[in-house]
């Protein structure tokens, strides 16, 4: 009853909000009068308005103050409508005292339904009527639910423990309802839900659909996913990324578009209700805990196309239709809203767009076929790729839409590039490449969970982080199978004449009559809530593919985090590694639609932070060297770390030693690898994570100017100077001595010159630019630290090191021309009593602007706030400054101009053949990034470099032998049960060679004999032979023949009917010779006459003929 109430609350507002189109909500009846004739029973009642105690107030039940408001007006004032109402009515021998409260949170102010003609939007409504109420029956609060609207009288449902009652105003057929008199009350019709006859209420299915029985075809009888066109994720995004491995709630604000074919098929009266019912199922699928993330599908905008749009081409060709739709939806994307506010134009922003069409779409051609969905892989949050096209096949379309949105989230098919759905692993689920009766489309596989988690953790779903101020659509909790029964679900798929034709496993597969009157299935389960029956359950309904007792629904249990696992093995043995710990959402595990856990699911900590022994190989260098024995483009190289600019710090970029190129050998270094040599920050999961100077991951500990972790800068003195002595050219001159233990060393020319900075030890051993030899600018490991020698072409040269130095050093200059001046500064250690806190003050300061996070298309610069000493402006730990006075960090946009065009290269799609040579393709696009999360597609001519290949051969290896079956023989015997036989050979893939049977897998060998029957065999029958010779050579005699009872096989049988047995003997007559026998002849019986004894017996001897033939017998008689 709770479910029914929530659904009817939703349906009621939907009906009333669409009253500008049709005042009558029964979708196939031309009048209320006609509808009432189809009710088994109903009653009339006159409701009255009363107070809380039931005392009469008025006959007026209509809300005179309600009005439809546009978003451009002031927000609705709840005081304009009565927030609390009480009504009384009587029917079916019962009295109903209604206690109602105004429902102001039914839908968000974002949600609109728009109807578009050829010139764009024609009409829209936004559900802002102030006349929707929910409540209960007075004194029965816990057992009753009421959802009513009084926009034009009482319209809605009253749900009690034993029955649901529908109530609506009785229409006045003689007067305009606006002028109807309420002085004596307005009659209303009330009827029970049980009075509704089970018949098809929707007569608008005039667009026929083709029959299809697509068992075993790709997803929902074929799904296609285009490759990802997204740019690699890098540091050009302006959004702050969420910490990895953290479960947070996401909100997918969705635009749903129905084409004119949908309007023609479902009719304007039902299109909104139907689409939102489908999206309700989609939302529920994404709320399933098996997804491993909390994702809310929110319908922010519904567009119903009543005519073709000028810039939108929708037809059977799925690829072209998707491309057109993605561009079109981007063109109408509201940029005035960020998802948290209501835009001035009243149009809601959307993150994802869904097109639903009645076209029988097909990928790669403009003809009908089995394709049901098409989407861009990993396109979510990219304005031109966060979209999908879906063929409407009834409520089962929800599974298609959820599947295609899954592709937008970066999911691949189960079993394609992963183990899910393969032998020995968990069964394929909602992302199955092929749907069968064994597929469970109500939940997600572990592979799908990993794909979406990786997508969201990588920062590509940041557009989903903003939570709308209110849920854009309050989905009904009622099961869709209760709204649309099995027959109606069949009609959605196969047309108005279809109905359910198999009733066994309806929760697993819905079988329907097609137009050709065949019982077919798409292997799509019936919607949840569809009535079912089993041997153990007399009346049940479907729940997640199973038949459960009617009315039962698992209790919703939200998930809770389990305990953290033990810390895992450290990623490094020294030098600072990372260890991780996991926890699972299983205490309890979410069930019955309960929410998945929010919060951190994986945590990290530093480990083995002690320095590696002297002489140890650099950790990044070792990772590059691991590729020395792996061929690269057919050759072997020795690889060294590439430390130049323009690459991701946590990708393993290696330089081919002795060659002028580098490449990315791995997308991520091993966890614990330093992001760069001069930072303690380390890489985790391919991202740079901050490490404090205490070597603790995420620590705020900071080095002071003396490189003391957490210090206040009091253990060293700052040395600064300017060397501008005029010196003779052509030799080395000393600039400054740097004592042992010095830190933050900087030596820099004040202007460009032909002179060179050099560095040597106290013992005159040159480390940089010695012996009149000029070194290439690079990093030099000297005195226990790294000196960076830089000589740009357009700037003065410099020498820098963090220190501390392990020996005394001397900075020299090799003079080739006049000394223009050299500045130097460094900090030297001192011995001081106390911390220095009383000698110097500290203050917050903004650091200089950071480098722009992107070179083009919009980046961000930040000014970090640090704590500094007042005496020398050096940075110290934050705890030395007053936390209450800390100013906010500054941020500004930078480099907003579009990026140069570049090629986007998508992932290779599956090979067209698994062996014997196939082809594989990938998407190659010329794109230009024009914003932090937005790019545009250009013509190929826009990119100046060579166009990458889009197609290449694959799987050229020979296929293994395979079984080939020849044609079946005829059925033997010709009737009754028998067998057909055929020859099965082990052949090569091209069928040119025959191999021994042992070379083909025995388990996959096709059968060589099957049972058959050509119909019932005929019954046994009497079979007669030819008649024998007549027994008399002259006159009458006898003929004999064989008579046998034989089966259809020719075998003797005793099953023939004696009553129809043919005679085996008959009388015959032979022609007699007329020449008389002479008296001299011997008197004897003619040999051929066998009946002479009968002649004597019947006294025929007196006759001349018989006496002559039987002379001997007749002698003496």
UniProtKB/Swiss-Prot annotation:
PROSITE patterns for this protein: ADAM_MEPRO (PS50215), PLAC (PS50900), TSP1 (PS50092), ZINC_PROTEASE (PS00142)
Coiled coil: none
One Pfam family here: TSP1_ADAMTS
Residues annotated as binding Zn(2+): 403, 407, 413
UniProt record, GO biological process: aorta development; cardiac septum development; coronary vasculature development; extracellular matrix organization; kidney development; proteolysis
GO molecular function, one term: metallopeptidase activity
Residue intervals of the PLAC domain: 1079-1117
Keyword Transferase: no
Span of domain Peptidase M12B: 250-468
Cofactor binding, per record: Binds 1 zinc ion per subunit.
Residues of the Disintegrin domain: 495-557
Entry cofactors: Zn(2+)
Active-site residue list: 404
Induction annotation: Isoform 1 and isoform 2 expressions are up-regulated by TNF in retinal pigment epithelial cells.
Propeptide, chain numbering: 22-244
Gene3D superfamilies per UniProt: 2.60.120.830, 3.40.1620.60, Collagenase (Catalytic Domain), Thrombospondin type-1 (TSP1) repeat
GO cellular component term, pick one: extracellular matrix
Keyword Signal found: yes
Region listing for Spacer, in residue ranges: 717-843
EC number: 3.4.24.-
InterPro entries linked: ADAMTS/ADAMTS-like, ADAMTS_ADAMTS-like, ADAMTS_CR_2, ADAMTS_CR_3, ADAMTS_spacer1, MetalloPept_cat_dom_sf, Peptidase_M12B, Peptidase_M12B_N
Highest rank taxon of the organism: Eukaryota
Cysteine disulfide links: 326-387, 362-369, 381-463, 420-447, 490-512, 501-519, 507-542, 532-547, 570-607, 574-612, 585-597, 911-954, 915-959, 926-943
Residues that carry a glycan: 99, 172, 222, 234, 724, 956
Record's protein name: A disintegrin and metalloproteinase with thrombospondin motifs 6
Source taxonomy: Eukaryota, Metazoa, Chordata, Craniata, Vertebrata
Gene name in the database record: ADAMTS6
């Amino acid at each position: 009853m709770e479910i029914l109430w929530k659904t009817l609350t939703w349906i009621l507002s939907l009906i009333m909000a669409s009253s500008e189109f049709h005042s009558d909500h029964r979708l196939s009846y031309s009048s209320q009068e006609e509808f009432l004739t189809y009710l088994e029973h109903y009653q009339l009642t006159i409701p009255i308005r009363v107070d809380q105690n039931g005392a009469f107030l008025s006959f007026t039940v209509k809300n005179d103050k309600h009005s439809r408001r546009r978003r451009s007006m002031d927000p609705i004032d709840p005081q304009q409508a009565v927030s609390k109402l009480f009504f009384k009515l009587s029917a079916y021998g019962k009295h109903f005292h209604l206690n109602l409260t105004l429902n102001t949170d039914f839908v968000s102010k974002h949600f609109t339904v728009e109807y578009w003609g050829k010139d764009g939007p024609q009409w829209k409504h936004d559900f802002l009527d102030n006349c929707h109420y929910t409540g209960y029956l007075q004194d029965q609060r816990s057992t009753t639910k009421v959802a009513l609207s009084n926009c034009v009288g009482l319209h809605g449902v009253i749900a009690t423990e034993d029955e649901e009652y529908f109530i609506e105003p009785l229409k006045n057929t003689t007067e305009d309802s606006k002028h109807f008199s309420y002085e004596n009350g307005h009659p209303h019709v009330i009827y029970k839900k049980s009075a509704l006859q089970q018949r098809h209420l929707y007569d608008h299915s005039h667009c026929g659909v083709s029959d299809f029985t697509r068992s075993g075809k790709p997803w929902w009888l074929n799904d296609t996913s285009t490759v990802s066109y997204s740019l690699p994720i890098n540091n050009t995004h302006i959004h702050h990324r969420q910490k990895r491995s953290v479960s947070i709630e996401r909100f997918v604000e969705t635009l749903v578009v129905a084409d004119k074919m949908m309007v023609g098929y479902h009719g304007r009266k039902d299109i909104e209700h139907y689409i939102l019912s489908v999206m309700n199922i989609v939302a529920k699928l994404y709320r399933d805990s098996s997804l491993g993330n909390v994702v809310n599908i929110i319908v922010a905008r519904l567009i119903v196309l009543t005519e073709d749009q000028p810039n939108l081409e929708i037809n059977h060709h799925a690829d072209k239709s998707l491309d057109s739709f993605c561009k079109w939806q981007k063109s109408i994307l509201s940029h005035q809203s960020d998802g948290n506010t209501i835009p001035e134009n009243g149009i809601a922003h959307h993150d994802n767009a869904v097109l639903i069409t009645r076209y029988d779409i097909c990928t790669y051609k403009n003809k009908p076929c089995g394709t049901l969905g098409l989407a861009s892989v990993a396109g979510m949050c990219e304005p031109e790729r966060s979209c999908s096209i879906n063929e409407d096949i009834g409520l089962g379309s929800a599974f298609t839409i959820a599947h295609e949105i899954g592709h937008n989230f970066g999911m691949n098919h189960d079993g394609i590039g992963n183990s899910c759905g393969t032998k020995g692993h968990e069964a394929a689920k909602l992302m199955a490449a092929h749907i069968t009766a064994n597929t469970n489309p109500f939940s997600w596989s572990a592979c799908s969970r990993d794909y979406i988690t990786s997508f969201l953790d990588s920062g590509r779903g940041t557009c989903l982080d903003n939570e709308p101020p209110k849920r854009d659509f309050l989905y009904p909790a009622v099961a869709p199978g209760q709204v649309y029964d099995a027959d109606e679900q069949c009609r959605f798929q196969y047309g108005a004449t279809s109905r359910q034709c198999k009733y066994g496993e309806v929760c697993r597969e819905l079988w329907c009559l097609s137009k050709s009157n065949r019982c077919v299935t798409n292997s799509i389960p019936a919607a949840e809530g569809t009535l079912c029956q089993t041997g153990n359950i007399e009346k049940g309904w479907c729940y997640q593919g199973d038949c459960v007792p009617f009315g039962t629904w698992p209790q919703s249990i939200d998930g809770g985090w389990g305990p953290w696992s033990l810390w895992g093995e450290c990623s490094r043995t020294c030098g600072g590694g990372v260890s991780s710990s996991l926890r699972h959402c299983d205490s309890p595990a979410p069930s019955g639609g309960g929410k998945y856990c929010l919060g951190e699911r994986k945590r990290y900590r530093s480990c083995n932070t002690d320095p590696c022994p002297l002489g140890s190989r650099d950790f990044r260098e070792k990772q590059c060297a691991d590729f020395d024995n792996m061929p690269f483009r057919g050759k072997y190289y020795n690889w060294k770390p590439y430390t130049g600019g323009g690459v991701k710090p946590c990708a393993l970029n290696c330089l081919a030693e002795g060659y002028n190129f580098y490449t990315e050998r791995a997308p991520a270094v091993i966890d614990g690898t330093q992001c760069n040599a001069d930072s303690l920050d380390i890489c985790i999961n391919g991202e740079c994570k901050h490490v404090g100077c205490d070597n603790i991951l995420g620590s705020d500990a900071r080095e002071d100017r003396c490189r003391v972790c957490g210090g206040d800068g009091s253990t060293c003195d700052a040395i600064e100077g300017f060397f501008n002595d005029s010196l003779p050219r052509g030799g080395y001159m000393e600039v400054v001595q740097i004592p042992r233990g010095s830190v933050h060393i900087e030596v820099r020319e004040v202007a460009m010159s032909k002179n060179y900075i050099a560095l040597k030890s106290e013992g005159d051993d040159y480390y940089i630019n010695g012996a009149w030899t000029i070194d290439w600018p690079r990093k030099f490991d000297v005195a226990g630290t790294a000196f960076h020698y830089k000589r740009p072409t357009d700037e003065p040269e410099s020498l820098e090191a963090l220190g501390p130095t392990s020996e005394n050093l001397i900075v020299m200059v090799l003079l080739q021309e006049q000394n223009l001046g050299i500045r130097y500064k460094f900090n030297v250690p001192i011995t001081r009593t106390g911390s220095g806190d009383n000698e110097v003050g500290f203050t917050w300061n903004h650091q200089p602007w950071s480098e722009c996070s992107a070179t083009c298309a919009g980046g961000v610069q930040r000014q970090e706030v640090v704590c500094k000493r007042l005496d020398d402006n050096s940075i110290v730990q934050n705890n030395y400054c007053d936390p209450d006075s800390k100013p906010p960090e500054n941020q500004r946009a930078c480099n907003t101009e579009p990026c140069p065009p570049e090629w986007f290269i998508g992932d290779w799609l599956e090979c067209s053949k698994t062996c014997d040579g196939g082809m594989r393709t990938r998407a190659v696009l010329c794109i230009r990034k024009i914003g932090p999360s937005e790019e545009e597609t250009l013509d190929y001519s826009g990119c100046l470099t060579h166009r990458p290949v889009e197609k290449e051969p694959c799987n050229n290896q020979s296929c293994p032998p395979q079984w080939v079956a020849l044609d079946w023989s005829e059925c033997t015997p010709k009737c009754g049960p028998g067998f057909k036989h055929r020859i099965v050979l082990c052949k090569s893939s091209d069928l040119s060679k025959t191999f021994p049977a042992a070379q083909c897998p025995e388990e996959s060998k096709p059968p060589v004999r099957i049972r058959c029957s050509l119909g019932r065999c005929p019954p046994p029958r009497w079979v007669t032979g030819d008649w024998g010779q007549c027994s008399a050579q002259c006159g009458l005699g006898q003929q004999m023949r064989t008579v046998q009872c034989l089966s259809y096989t020719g075998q003797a049988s005793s099953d023939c009917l004696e009553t129809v047995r043919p005679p085996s003997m008959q009388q015959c007559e032979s022609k007699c010779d007329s020449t008389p026998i002479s008296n001299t002849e011997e008197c004897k019986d003619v040999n051929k006459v066998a009946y002479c004894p009968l002649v004597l017996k019947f006294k025929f001897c007196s006759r001349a003929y018989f006496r002559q033939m039987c002379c001997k017998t007749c002698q003496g008689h």
